[in-house]
């Protein structure tokens, strides 16, 4: 059985000591999906909605990157790491569902999957925030890690 890493020998919450871990390249890809009701999908023009606050998806991309960079301030035991890259992409399918991908990269002693998860999550929340005045019937779902490379083991949801 795998050990929970953020619990110490005294059974108390604890940050993981990464000081002896090897520095390697780490990449993580997370996704989140946003489902829109028809009253919102009717308002999409060229794959985006423009509001008084600006482009919904442009704001969400910026928010996702900003959030990924601040993950250590939001998740108690995440280490502050100097991220090498963070890319957020939002695609709208024909049914009116937005797929948000956040891919983060770092060369460090610890993984970057929480940063990718936070980036995808906050991008989705930003989409909701910017269009909730039109409808509250927006559903954010399936926020998940798609893949990670580096560290003890790689992970790929499509191959597991």
Per-range role (PLM):
Residues 1-79, 85-160:
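C-terminal binding/interaction regions
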């Amino acid at each position: 059985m795998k050990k929970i890493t953020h619990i110490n020998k005294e059974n108390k919450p604890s940050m993981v000591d990464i000081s002896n871990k090897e520095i390697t390249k780490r990449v993580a890809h997370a996704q989140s999906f946003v489902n829109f009701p028809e009253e919102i999908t009717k308002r999409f023009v060229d794959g985006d909605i423009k509001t008084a606050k600006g482009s919904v998806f442009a704001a969400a991309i910026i928010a996702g990157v900003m959030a990924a960079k601040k993950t250590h301030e939001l998740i108690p035991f995440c280490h502050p790491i100097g991220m090498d890259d963070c890319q957020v992409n939002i695609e709208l399918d024909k049914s009116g569902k937005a797929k948000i991908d956040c891919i983060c990269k770092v060369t460090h002693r610890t993984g970057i999957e929480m940063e990718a998860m936070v980036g995808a999550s906050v991008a989705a929340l930003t989409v909701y925030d910017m269009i909730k005045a039109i409808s509250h019937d927006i559903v954010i779902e399936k926020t998940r890690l798609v893949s990670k490379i580096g560290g003890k083991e790689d992970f790929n949801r499509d191959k597991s």
